[in-house]
């Protein structure tokens, strides 16, 4: 009987710990403010906003973006005692999504659903996530940025020039990209995966311990790693490639016509293809 009671207690503790681990906490401004714990009564609220071309998420909200014609829309689904603590507004052509100042909250679910005809900028500062539900097509340049531990995911991007960056421990995972010039940068311990890319020119840099993986095709590519990070582009076919490593990081690339390599430190550059080489041997 005692063993059974102990087993039941253990199971209850496991479920309790799991439930707690699913909660998110956010505090802005005064940490001494009383924490608002989300209720179990969930509501949906439509928020009227002006036109915007950029989305900026601060803090921990999760955002789903859908590209569609018509007026822009914002719909929030969360607990009834949390919803009025959000600060959602359009300023300088940017939709800002976050919490009001001096807020201390604990919640389990906060979904923000956003729709607009066009975007040219997407950014996350904090631990929030953005999901591009049906991709994004624009004739403009497009900037995608994560600063912090948040994530941006999606598939089906078509734009002019594209700039994608991670600063911190966040992740960006986007598939099926068509653009003119692609610029990729990872600073910190974050990771980036871009699959099935079609680009004219590509520039990719890693600073720190993060990594980036790119697949697809490009005409020219310039790669650099400073630190212990890794750049995996052996599945990204390029005609002409320049690759440099400073530190202990690594680059794996794919060049068909020409490859220039420079290394400083213990880092390495590996390649596939049969290009003309400018690859001085270390003395």
Walk through the language-model features, giving the residues of each.
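Intrinsically disordered, low-complexity terminal regions
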Residues: 1-283
